[in-house]
């Protein structure tokens, strides 16, 4: 069951979850999966225990910012459990028959991965909750006085649900997951390990300091590190460089308008808008998002985690505020009242 055929996409619209360009770089076993040490350690224990009892792994809930490896880890879990996996996302379930067809097609101990699980429709979620707990499905046939309920048994399967918005997952659904894990942004050291591993796969020779420079610009996210590594490979190829040096990386980052802190042009637009349009804040996320042409979801899911981690933005009960570090990074002068306010917040 560990061959490529064990990975099944349920909708062509969901292939972004596992596109071919990323597939070659995805680790297949825990040993090759860098970072998220606590998540790997606990999951390894639970997987081993389940295999020793010859049982399906309990349902797993994965949360965290996008691009950190939730889909990859789901595939590794299936591999370690010697199980097949079906990959999809919540928006693919439009009608009850969609989830019924998928659940009844599962094998014993197989894995169903649902990304963006917070976006499930209520009727689909209700059916899924019953399936997760009782391994049965209630299906209503007919209408009105002739309606009757048919109960269908399901194989013991493992549902892996992933989301970037755990707060939007309802309590009844969340309670069905026996294992929960949160992904955190990766450290530079962890990203360097990922870059070195993937440079070998891509047949790239990269110097140590170049790998660190690339890691520093990857926003703590392996998906971004992989994307940048490919672009740097293009530059090295065109310039005739056999080895990726820090100079090559610097040229590439400048072309992509990524600065030394890993901020791209939109990151800087967010900080400039916060400082110049809203006097450093506080300002609500919806207002800030509109000012830079983003949705509140994209601002919260993609941009904010890194800006907060790097200390450029702080969250308060009144809204987002630019920190002193943000002013310094953009070479903007901080007004005295804002400076005093930031000092009060820091203490």
From Swiss-Prot:
Sequence segments annotated as region (Small ATPAse domain (RuvB-S)): 187-257
Cellular compartments per GO CC: cytoplasm; Holliday junction resolvase complex
Record EC number: 3.6.4.-
Signal peptide (from-to): none
Residues binding Mg(2+): 71
Any one GO molecular function term: four-way junction helicase activity
Cited InterPro entries: AAA+_ATPase (IPR003593), AAA_lid_4 (IPR041445), DNA_helicase_Holl-junc_RuvB (IPR004605), P-loop_NTPase (IPR027417), RuvB-like_N (IPR008824), RuvB_C (IPR008823), WH-like_DNA-bd_sf (IPR036388), WH_DNA-bd_sf (IPR036390)
One Pfam family named in its UniProt record: RuvB_N
Major location category of this protein: cytoplasm
Large ATPase domain (RuvB-L) as annotated region, ranges: 1-186
GO biological process annotation, one example: DNA repair
The entry's keywords: ATP-binding, Cytoplasm, DNA damage, DNA recombination, DNA repair, DNA-binding, Hydrolase, Nucleotide-binding
SUPFAM superfamilies membership: P-loop containing nucleoside triphosphate hydrolases, Winged helix' DNA-binding domain
Binding site for DNA: 315, 320
Binding site for ATP: 25-26, 67, 70-72, 133-135, 176, 186, 223
Annotated stretches, region: Head domain (RuvB-H): 260-347
Protein family according to the UniProt entry: Belongs to the RuvB family.
Domain note: Has 3 domains, the large (RuvB-L) and small ATPase (RuvB-S) domains and the C-terminal head (RuvB-H) domain. The head domain binds DNA, while the ATPase domains jointly bind ATP, ADP or are empty depending on the state of the subunit in the translocation cycle. During a single DNA translocation step the structure of each domain remains the same, but their relative positions change.
Subunit text: Homohexamer. Forms an RuvA(8)-RuvB(12)-Holliday junction (HJ) complex. HJ DNA is sandwiched between 2 RuvA tetramers; dsDNA enters through RuvA and exits via RuvB. An RuvB hexamer assembles on each DNA strand where it exits the tetramer. Each RuvB hexamer is contacted by two RuvA subunits (via domain III) on 2 adjacent RuvB subunits; this complex drives branch migration. In the full resolvosome a probable DNA-RuvA(4)-RuvB(12)-RuvC(2) complex forms which resolves the HJ.
Protein name (database record): Holliday junction branch migration complex subunit RuvB
Species for this entry: Borreliella afzelii (strain PKo)
């Amino acid at each position: 069951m560990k061959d490529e055929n064990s990975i099944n996409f349920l909708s062509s619209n969901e292939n972004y979850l596992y596109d071919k360009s990323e597939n070659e770089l995805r680790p297949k076993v825990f040993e090759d999966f860098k970072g998220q040490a606590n998540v790997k350690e606990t999951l390894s224990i639970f997987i081993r225990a389940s295999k020793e009892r010859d049982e399906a792994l309990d349902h797993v809930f994965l949360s965290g910012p996008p691009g950190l490896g939730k889909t990859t880890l789901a595939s590794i879990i299936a591999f370690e459990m010697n199980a097949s996996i079906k990959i999809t996302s919540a928006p693919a379930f439009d009608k009850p028959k969609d989830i019924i067809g998928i659940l009844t097609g599962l094998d014993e101990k197989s894995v169903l991965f649902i990304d963006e699980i917070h976006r499930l429709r209520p009727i689909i979620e209700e059916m899924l909750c019953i399936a997760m707990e009782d391994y049965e499905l209630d299906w209503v046939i007919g209408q009105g006085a002739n309606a009757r309920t048919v109960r269908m048994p399901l194989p013991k399967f493992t549902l892996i649900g992933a989301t970037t918005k755990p707060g939007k997952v309802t309590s009844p659904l969340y309670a069905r997951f026996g294992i929960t894990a949160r992904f955190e942004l990766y450290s530079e050291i962890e990203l360097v390990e990922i870059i070195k591993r993937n440079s070998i796969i891509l047949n790239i020779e990269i110097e140590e300091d170049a790998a660190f420079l690339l890691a520093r610009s990857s926003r703590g996210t392996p998906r971004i590190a992989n994307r940048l590594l490919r672009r740097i490979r293009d530059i090295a190829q065109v310039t005739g460089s056999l080895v990726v040096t820090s100079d090559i990386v610097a040229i590439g980052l400048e072309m992509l308008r990524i600065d030394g802190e890993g901020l791209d042009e939109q990151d800087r637009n967010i900080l400039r808008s916060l400082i110049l349009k809203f006097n450093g804040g506080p300002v609500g996320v919806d207002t800030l998002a509109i000012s830079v042409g983003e949705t509140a979801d994209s601002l919260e899911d993609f941009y904010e985690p890194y800006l907060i981690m790097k200390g450029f933005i702080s969250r308060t009960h009144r809204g987002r505020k630019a920190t002193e570090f943000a002013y310094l990074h953009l070479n903007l002068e901080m007004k005295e009242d804002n400076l005093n306010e930031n000092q009060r917040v820091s203490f």
